[in-house]
């Protein structure tokens, strides 16, 4: 069967997924980006790319979505219009008849703050940040469209993403990283290769309407991870910076307002995923070797 993947948003995770399927004869790839320069770059890589910034619909949407069998959504929701793909093209998507799989990339932020406690795939969503509220609203809008139009939507709640060119190893190289210390602060992480594993497993075994926590096996305090990566890179450990007095942007401070440890049982029990990088230790060791 000929398959066509369309990615609304050709960011870090989408490009990683594309790199795994682009070389296969039965896949064609298309997607959207926000600038002509990026469009031209993707075109040189053989990716059919359309300009879309979420403010106005694609003029050639029928042609763009012709033959699409799989769709990945990684565009973030906005304050005024919610999910930009649904706002601009919800009706167009509802008329597609050949879609086998839709993946919506969300965030574990929909669970809110749990004071360092555990959450799992069944934990009720209780976002405590505006960012989490917008993501949860977008998730629900996608599921509503899925129900009304019988679309195979799947939700992927991602932890903090790292991988080649992205993560603590890059911040340490550039000198941007600060070791913020806050008691009982936990973040869950996921290597981009394992996100791709999960997406491919879901494509192979669709379960429309299902949600998955996409994180590794070991949530950890951010300062602990920074120390570990410093040691791997043979760098001196950074000085502790107390969260209460740290000079942080409002966005960064908002991340530290939530602490939880996220379980990943469903990607293993239902999709059969065996993580390549089960903890940050294996993941960063592979990146800096």
What are these regions (language model features)?
Residues 205-252:
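Mid/C-terminal beta-alpha module of Rossmann-like enzyme folds, strongest
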Residues 52-56, 254-289:
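C-terminal amphipathic/interface module of NAD(P)-dependent oxidoreductases
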Residues 115-155:
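Catalytic helix-loop patch of NAD(P)-dependent Rossmann-fold dehydrogenases
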Residues 14-15:
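N-terminal Rossmann-fold NAD(P) dinucleotide-binding loop
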Residues 90-130:
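Conserved Rossmann-fold NAD(P)-dependent oxidoreductase catalytic core, especially the SDR/UDP-sugar
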Residues 136, 149-151, 161-172, 201-212, ...:
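Glycine/proline-rich active-site loop of Rossmann-fold NAD(P)-dependent oxidoreductases
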């Amino acid at each position: 069967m000929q398959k066509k993947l369309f990615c609304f948003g050709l960011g870090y995770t989408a490009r990683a997924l594309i790199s795994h399927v682009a070389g296969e004869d039965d896949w064609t790839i298309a997607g959207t980006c926000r600038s002509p320069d990026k469009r031209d770059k993707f075109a040189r890589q053989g990716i059919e790319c359309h300009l879309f910034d979420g403010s106005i619909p694609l003029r050639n949407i029928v042609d763009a979505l012709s033959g699409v069998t799989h769709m990945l959504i990684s565009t973030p929701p906005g304050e005024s219009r919610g999910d930009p793909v649904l706002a601009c093209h919800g009706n167009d998507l509802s008329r597609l008849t050949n879609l086998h799989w839709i993946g919506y990339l969300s965030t574990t932020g929909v669970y809110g703050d749990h004071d360092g406690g555990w959450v799992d795939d069944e934990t009720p969503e209780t976002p405590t940040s505006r960012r989490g509220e917008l993501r949860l609203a977008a998730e629900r809008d996608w599921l509503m469209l899925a129900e009304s139009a019988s679309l195979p939507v799947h939700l992927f709640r991602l932890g903090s993403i790292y991988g080649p060119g992205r993560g603590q190893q890059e911040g340490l190289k550039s000198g941007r990283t600060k070791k913020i210390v806050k008691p009982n602060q936990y973040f869950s992480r996921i290597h981009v290769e394992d996100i791709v594993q999960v997406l491919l497993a879901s494509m192979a075994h669709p379960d429309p309407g299902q949600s998955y926590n996409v994180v590794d096996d070991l949530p950890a305090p951010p300062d602990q991870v920074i120390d570990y990566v410093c040691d791997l890179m043979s760098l001196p450990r950074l000085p502790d910076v107390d969260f209460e007095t740290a000079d942080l942007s409002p966005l960064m401070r908002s991340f530290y307002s939530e602490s939880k440890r996220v379980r990943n049982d469903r990607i293993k029990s239902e999709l059969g995923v065996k993580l390549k990088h089960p903890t940050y230790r294996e993941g960063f060791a592979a990146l800096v070797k």
